[in-house]
């Protein structure tokens, strides 16, 4: 193989091509690749930030939901306690009112019983007086007195 001027000219043309490519073609390509790499890195960083923000937001939401659940449970428990207290108070009032009514009814029944006894005593006294009066008006005879006593018993 012989080295001649064509090889030198081709080497010079190649070096000119390399220099031209390094000066005018390679910088825009490298710049485009760097910009693309930067955009990808920025996108990944934004995705990481969004992911961490989402995680923080989820934690805040979970915390607020937990607080809301606790507040709701506390309010329900308080309402249930109030309702139970109202029910107990109503039961106590109803029992007290019932006891008053029973006591009043007993007192009224006792009073009526006393009045009935007094009326019965008065009637017995009247009948006894009538019976004694009739016995004293008639002659003393066992048969007659027995009849009067039977009649007196039926009247009582």
Swiss-Prot record:
It comes from the Bacteria. One of its GO terms (cellular component) is plasma membrane. Keywords: ATP synthesis, Cell inner membrane, Cell membrane, CF(0), Hydrogen ion transport, Ion transport, Membrane, Transmembrane, Transmembrane helix, Transport. One of its GO terms (molecular function) is proton-transporting ATPase activity, rotational mechanism. It is a single-pass membrane protein. The keyword Magnesium does not apply. It is found in: Cell inner membrane. The chain crosses the membrane at residues 7-27. InterPro entries: ATP_synth_B-like_membr_sf, ATP_synth_b/b'su_bac/chlpt, ATP_synth_F0_bsu_bac, ATP_synthase_B_chain. Disulfide bonds: none annotated. HAMAP family: ATP_synth_b_bprime (MF_01398). F-type ATPases have 2 components, F(1) - the catalytic core - and F(0) - the membrane proton channel. F(1) has five subunits: alpha(3), beta(3), gamma(1), delta(1), epsilon(1). F(0) has three main subunits: a(1), b(2) and c(10-14). The alpha and beta chains form an alternating ring which encloses part of the gamma chain. F(1) is attached to F(0) by a central stalk formed by the gamma and epsilon chains, while a peripheral stalk is formed by the delta and b chains. Belongs to the ATPase B chain family. F(1)F(0) ATP synthase produces ATP from ADP in the presence of a proton or sodium gradient. F-type ATPases consist of two structural domains, F(1) containing the extramembraneous catalytic core and F(0) containing the membrane proton channel, linked together by a central stalk and a peripheral stalk. During catalysis, ATP synthesis in the catalytic domain of F(1) is coupled via a rotary mechanism of the central stalk subunits to proton translocation. This is ATP synthase subunit b. It comes from Verminephrobacter eiseniae (strain EF01-2). The gene is atpF.
């Amino acid at each position: 193989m012989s080295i001649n001027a064509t090889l030198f000219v081709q080497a010079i043309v190649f070096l000119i091509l390399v220099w031209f490519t390094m000066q005018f073609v390679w910088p825009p390509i490298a710049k485009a690749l760097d910009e693309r790499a930067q955009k990808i890195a920025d996108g990944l960083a934004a995705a990481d930030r969004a992911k961490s923000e989402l995680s923080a937001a989820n934690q805040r939401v979970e915390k607020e939901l937990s607080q809301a659940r606790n507040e709701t449970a506390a309010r329900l428990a308080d309402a249930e306690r109030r309702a139970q207290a109202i029910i107990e108070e109503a039961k106590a009032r109803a029992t007290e009112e019932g006891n008053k009514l029973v006591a009043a009814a007993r007192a009224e029944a006792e009073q009526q019983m006393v009045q009935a006894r007094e009326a019965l005593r008065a009637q017995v006294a009247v009948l006894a007086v009538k019976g004694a009066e009739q016995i004293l008006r008639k002659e003393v005879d066992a048969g007659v007195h027995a009849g009067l006593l039977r009649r007196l018993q039926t009247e009582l």
